[in-house]
């Protein structure tokens, strides 16, 4: 009897020293996500927050962003860049180029097609039982008087993502709302950029910090 208890105790002790399986989180997006893996990027900031809360043993963070990507591009590389890696969580942060490129190069994505491809991505992810976090695109221009050229489309595409999140009962990181609220409080000179972005789109240090804070709140609650 004593021998059995000894061996049971030994086994339990050995199990306690085995490394815990980490939750693999993939951030799937465009150049903003690609830059997120840089030292000052939002993905690295999330990793730092995770460590500060003594949760580094629980999560592994992976960036899968490619500059210029739109929702169609994400759909095309979903299998290789996300599903093949067997993540526990995927954070989808897309939409800026779908709107921005309508004006800059005429290669944006119409709203109906945006919703179709976004939903197709979610269908494939859901089939793999991967937890999914949706994010609205933040800004194309930071003016607070609603005079940014593409404010209307940014609101429209953000509403599409909000509706998809609600329909599928998925967690939402509403970066559009968070950025607008931050700019309304701090951008008193109605600047087009320089508050949360370097150029009206790509994040500066404060923008990366805000994105990290908003995403981390949701990720750690899953």
Region spans (language model):
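Active-site segments of SGNH/GDSL-like serine hydrolases
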Residues: 93-97, 122-156
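Catalytic His-Asp segment of secreted/periplasmic serine-dependent ester chemistry enzymes
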Residues: 38, 138-222
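Serine-esterase "nucleophile elbow" of acetyl-processing enzymes
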Residues: 15-67, 72, 77-86
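Proline-aspartate-enriched helix->loop->beta-strand connector
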Residues: 83-92, 96
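Charged, glycine-enriched surface loops/patches
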Residues: 109-135, 160-164, 168-170
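Solvent-exposed loop/turn segments at secondary-structure junctions
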Residues: 31-35, 66-71, 96-101, 138-142, ...
């Amino acid at each position: 009897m004593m021998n059995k208890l000894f061996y049971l105790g030994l086994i339990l002790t050995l199990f306690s020293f085995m490394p815990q399986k980490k939750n693999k989180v993939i951030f799937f997006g465009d150049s903003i996500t690609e830059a997120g893996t840089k030292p000052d990027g939002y993905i690295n900031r999330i990793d730092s927050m995770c460590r500060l809360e003594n949760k580094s043993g629980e999560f592994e963070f992976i960036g899968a962003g490619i500059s210029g990507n739109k929702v169609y591009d994400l759909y095309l590389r979903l299998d290789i860049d996300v599903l093949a890696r067997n993540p526990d969580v995927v954070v989808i942060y897309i939409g800026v180029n779908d709107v921005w490129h309508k004006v800059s190069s005429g290669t944006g994505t119409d709203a109906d097609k945006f919703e179709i491809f976004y939903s197709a991505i979610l269908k494939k992810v859901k089939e793999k039982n991967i937890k999914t976090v949706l994010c609205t695109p933040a800004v194309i221009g930071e003016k607070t008087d609603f005079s940014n050229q593409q404010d209307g489309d940014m609101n429209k595409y953000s509403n599409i993502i909000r509706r998809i999140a609600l329909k599928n009962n998925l967690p939402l990181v509403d970066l559009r709302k968070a950025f607008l609220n931050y700019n309304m409080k701090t951008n008193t000179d109605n600047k087009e950029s320089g508050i949360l972005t370097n150029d009206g789109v790509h994040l500066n240090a404060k923008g990366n910090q805000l994105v990290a804070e908003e995403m981390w709140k949701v990720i750690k609650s899953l």
